[in-house]
Amino acid sequence: MDDGLRDRPGVTSRFFHSLEVKYQYYLDRLTPHTAFRWVIALISLVFFASRIILLQGFYIVAYAVGIYYLNLFLLFLTPSIDPALEFEDEDDGPVLPSKTNDEFRPFMRRLPEFKFWHSFMKATLIAITCTFFEFFDVPVFWPILVMYFFILTFLTLKRQIMHMIKYRYIPFTVGKPRMAGKEDTGKVVVG
């Protein structure tokens, strides 16, 4: 047998590889356009919500995707290195004194914004797809799910805010910090 024939990828693997390359190309093109990406995400979310309202069903799918959105949002708000674990590790023994509490450290997210958007979109598209299949429409009393979702959201966000207050970090930045020069403190004397 010819070994060169076995080493060539099959037709299906070449097809899926070309799809993967095209998908990554379009993701790379969308990366710098944050506002546009989130507008697309909100439009898809409104479409999903309108399907839930018009069909008057698939409440379990909506609840599951809502819990997933909450989990993604919490990962987005959480720092990549948990300060609670840092403070627990400091009890290992005597160390030289340092002043690391006042030191500036940039906020690094556990889930970056692009991955947050990408996971959000995948979950929304999967949820929209689930609404086309009848076996995902499990009969359930939806007010209980709504109440439980709001209680769960309130408790988890309260815990996250308390964590942010305790370890003094802010996960949101408005923009790039700008350097300012010294302010003029006196008059110019012309002599």
UniProtKB/Swiss-Prot annotation:
Q: Which UniProt keywords apply?
A: Membrane, Protein transport, Transmembrane, Transmembrane helix, Transport
Q: Name one GO cellular component term.
A: endoplasmic reticulum
Membrane-protein topology: Multi-pass membrane protein
Q: Where are the transmembrane segments?
A: 35-55, 57-77, 135-155
GO process terms (BP): IRE1-mediated unfolded protein response; protein retention in ER lumen; protein transport; retrograde vesicle-mediated transport, Golgi to endoplasmic reticulum
Q: Which Cys-Cys disulphide bridges does the record give? A: none
- Answer whether the UniProt record assigns the keyword Transport to this protein: yes
* Presence of keyword Transport: yes
Matching InterPro entries, A to Z?
Answer: Rer1
Compartments where found: Membrane
Superkingdom of the source species: Eukaryota
According to its UniProt entry, the function of this protein is described as: May be involved in protein transport along the secretory pathway.
- Cross-referenced PANTHER family: PROTEIN RER1 (PTHR10743:SF0)
Member of which family?
Answer: Belongs to the RER1 family.
- The name this protein goes by in its record: Protein RER1 homolog
Organism from which the protein derives? Caenorhabditis elegans
Gene giving rise to this polypeptide: rer-1
